[in-house]
């Protein structure tokens, strides 16, 4: 029995030794949730990080000669490997006091948040790639890190906004945490005290839900969003920028997302006011620096990534267009540009890095860099980095799992309205006229139409009298129930001070039978003297260039008592001296003389009876000559006329306002009332009303206008 027992013992010993000599693959450590959760609960990642490092290292051939591009490509196509690599990078890059373990241990909410982040390898990967600087110098150095404050900012968003945990809003949350307000370009008009990542997230979340951001915002990566949310402008200014531009001229937004064009509305001059807010920046004007600052701001307000650009003795703007391509605005080309994405780059390098980020190449290169950071042998590290792919070898559209649905931007015309207006209320007897209900429209402009007709952001139509217009006009047919004095108020939007419209009615002064003139521009009948007496402020009498002296004679058809006269030169302002006479028998007798005529020369004189009245132009201002008269009216009572002046306030610039009343004389019956704009910075008209002076303010509702 003793020998048999000894034999069995020897057999067991041999079997045990054999088993011990077999490979231990079934027992080898693999990345797993249990060990990760244990590290989070303990608030100590030392052991877990070491296990991750060892696991990653054993995936790489020990012999540098065996490290090939094919083998590295195979590793990078292994989702488990990439998740583990991103996790190891995430643990290693969080620093400061507390570190990742200390942060998780400090509060139960911290622990739950860290567990949520670390349970998603693709999320950690995107966070790390988003935080990675774009310039090659910083990437080679690889000393960048993430402090615990980033996690705290992100955690606040995570708990305050449950929708921030997936899709578009997750990308937005990551961007806000990584690039807090004020960490982008800092320039004129920026906030004195910066907002918080939580408030900035709420600002853009609300704007997106209200359909205030451009359609292409939905297609942005987290990295692209960092160049939106990092704006140094206040949240109040960002909201103002959207409302002001959507009100004043929404075509900038919804036609090709060209919001940077608004910066061109800044007058190129030293500002006349301090840059307290972005509205002050826009109104006060500025040279290249302030214009660049505003250009970056207004892009970011609408969700368009933008960066300030330095050029020789100049500043410009780089922005991402709706097709995903970066462009330069307000400056010269890329080859003279310098800009920064955490590190300084030339314009050419920036474009290369953007191109790289659009492909898997950026992620693959950084993954190999992270992997090399876990190795110790110099030859092994060099062999790994030698396999980095070229951009041309990379596949397009590197979309991670939490970026679903990135596609072409929706057509701007399908954009829903943000703020449908309440029903308009009109008092009995009040004449209410919508801007789009015009009978005549026109203008003389250096660029584009004198008056732009566009869709109002709140429904219906609006008119925009543009900055490049020398003069513009619009006529509205109205029916006046009773002759008398009416108060004209208008709903307008302006972004600069000093903006106004000239209003004019006809009918109180005499209808002129005919007119003759000393000269007509190129004998063009459409510019003949009759055009100055037709009660149409879109027509004019013009003389030939090179002439400063001439005359126009009016025939009233019969002798009439006259004591008042209006002469309108619009914006031409070419006359410096003139004389007005009336015919008494065969003689001309003077009524009055003057210098400038301008928009409205309104004269009252002792009554005389006359059938013929003559305006003589005696001298001009410019070398080219060629006076132009848009209207001449005479009578014994004035027509309604005057200026509608818009107020400017930094807090409400660009938003709708109702002007102070302008008293206008109207004559009962059908007529046309005219609104004209001089050369100025731009004004938008929504509607106007004419109320009999002294009438009741009782109102009734009008059906809402149709939405777009």
Model-derived features with residue positions:
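Secondary-structure boundary elements
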Residues: 66, 81-82, 110-281
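Hydrophobic/aromatic-rich core segments of domains that either
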Residues: 272-279, 284, 289-374
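Long, compositionally biased intrinsically disordered regions
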Residues: 346-430, 643
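Disordered, acidic Ser/Thr/Pro-rich linker "stalks" and the adjacent N-terminal cap
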Residues: 436-462, 507-559, 570-577, 593-596, ...
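Short beta-strands within extracellular/lumenal beta-sheet-rich domains
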Residues: 458-480, 498, 545-558, 657-660
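A short beta-strand element within beta-rich, extracytoplasmic domains
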Residues: 474, 478-495, 560-572, 615
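Extended, low-complexity, turn-rich repeat/linker tracts enriched in Gly/Pro/Ser/Thr and Asp/Glu
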Residues: 481-483, 492-501, 570-576, 622, ...
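Trp- and acidic/polar-enriched beta-sheet ligand-binding modules for extracellular glycan
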Residues: 508, 544-550, 559-562, 569-639, ...
């Amino acid at each position: 029995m003793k020998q048999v027992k000894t034999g069995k013992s020897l057999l067991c010993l041999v079997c045990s030794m054999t088993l011990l000599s077999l490979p231990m693959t079934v027992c080898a450590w693999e990345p797993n949730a249990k060990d990760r959760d244990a590290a989070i609960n303990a608030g100590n990642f030392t052991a877990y990080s070491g296990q991750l490092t060892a696991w990653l290292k054993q995936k790489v051939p020990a012999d540098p000669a065996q490290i090939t591009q094919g083998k590295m490509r195979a590793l990078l196509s292994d989702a488990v490997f990439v998740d583990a690599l991103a996790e190891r990078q995430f643990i290693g890059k969080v620093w400061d006091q507390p570190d990742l373990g200390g942060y998780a241990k400090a509060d139960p909410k911290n622990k739950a948040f860290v567990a949520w982040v670390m349970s998603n390898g693709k999320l950690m990967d995107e966070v790390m790639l988003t935080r990675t600087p774009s310039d090659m110098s910083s990437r080679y150095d690889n000393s960048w890190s993430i402090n615990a404050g980033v996690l705290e900012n992100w955690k606040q968003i995570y708990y305050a906004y449950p929708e921030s945990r997936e899709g578009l809003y997750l990308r937005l949350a990551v961007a806000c945490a990584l690039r807090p307000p004020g960490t982008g370009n800092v320039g004129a008009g920026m906030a004195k005290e910066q907002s918080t990542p939580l408030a900035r997230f709420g600002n853009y979340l609300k704007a997106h839900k209200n359909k205030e951001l451009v359609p292409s915002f939905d297609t942005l990566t987290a990295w692209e969003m960092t160049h939106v949310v990092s704006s140094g402008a206040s949240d109040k200014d960002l909201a103002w920028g959207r409302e002001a531009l959507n009100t004043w001229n929404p075509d900038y937004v919804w036609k090709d997302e060209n919001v940077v064009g608004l910066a061109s509305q800044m007058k190129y001059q030293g500002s006349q006011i301090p840059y307290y807010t972005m509205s002050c920046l826009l109104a006060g004007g500025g040279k290249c620096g302030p214009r660049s600052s505003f250009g970056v701001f207004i892009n970011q307000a609408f969700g368009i990534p933008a960066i300030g650009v330095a050029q020789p003795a100049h500043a410009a703007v780089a922005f991402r267009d709706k097709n995903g391509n970066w462009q330069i605005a307000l400056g010269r080309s890329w080859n003279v540009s310098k800009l920064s994405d955490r590190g300084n780059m030339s314009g050419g390098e920036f474009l290369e890095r953007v191109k790289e980020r659009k492909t898997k190449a950026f992620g693959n290169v950084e993954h190999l860099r992270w992997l090399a950071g876990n190795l110790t042998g110099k030859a092994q590290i060099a062999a790994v980095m030698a396999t980095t792919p070229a951009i041309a070898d990379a596949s397009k559209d590197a979309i991670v799992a939490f970026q679903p649905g990135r596609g072409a931007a929706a057509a701007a015309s399908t954009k829903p309205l943000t703020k449908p207006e309440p029903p308009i209320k009109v008092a009995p007897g009040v004449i209410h006229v919508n801007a789009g209900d015009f009978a005549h429209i026109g203008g003389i402009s250096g660029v584009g139409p004198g008056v732009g007709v566009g869709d109002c952001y709140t429904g219906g139509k609006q008119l925009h009298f543009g900055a490049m217009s020398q003069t513009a006009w619009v006529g509205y047919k109205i029916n006046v129930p009773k002759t008398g004095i009416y108060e004209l108020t208008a709903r307008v939007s302006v972004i600069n001070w000093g903006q106004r419209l000239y209003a004019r009615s006809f009918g109180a002064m005499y209808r002129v039978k005919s007119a003759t003139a000393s000269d007509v521009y190129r004998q063009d009948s459409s510019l003949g003297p009759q055009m100055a007496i037709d009660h149409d402020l879109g027509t004019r009498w013009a003389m030939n260039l090179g002439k400063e002296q001439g005359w126009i004679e009016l025939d009233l058809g019969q002798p009439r008592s006259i004591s008042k006269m209006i002469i309108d030169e619009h914006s031409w302002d070419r006359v410096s001296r003139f004389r007005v006479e009336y015919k008494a028998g065969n003689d001309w007798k003077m009524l009055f003389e003057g210098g400038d005529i301008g928009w409205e020369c309104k004269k009252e004189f002792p009554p005389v009876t006359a059938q013929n009245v003559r305006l003589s132009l005696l001298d001009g201002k410019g070398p080219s000559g060629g006076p132009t008269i848009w209207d001449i009216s005479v009578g014994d009572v004035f027509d309604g006329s005057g200026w509608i002046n818009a107020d400017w306030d930094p807090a409400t610039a660009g938003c709708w306002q109702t002007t102070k009343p302008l008293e206008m004389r109207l004559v009962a019956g059908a007529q046309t009332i005219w609104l004209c704009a001089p050369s100025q910075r731009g004004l938008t008209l929504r509607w106007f009303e004419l109320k009999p002076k002294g009438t009741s303010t009782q109102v009734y509702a009008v059906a809402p206008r149709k939405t777009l």
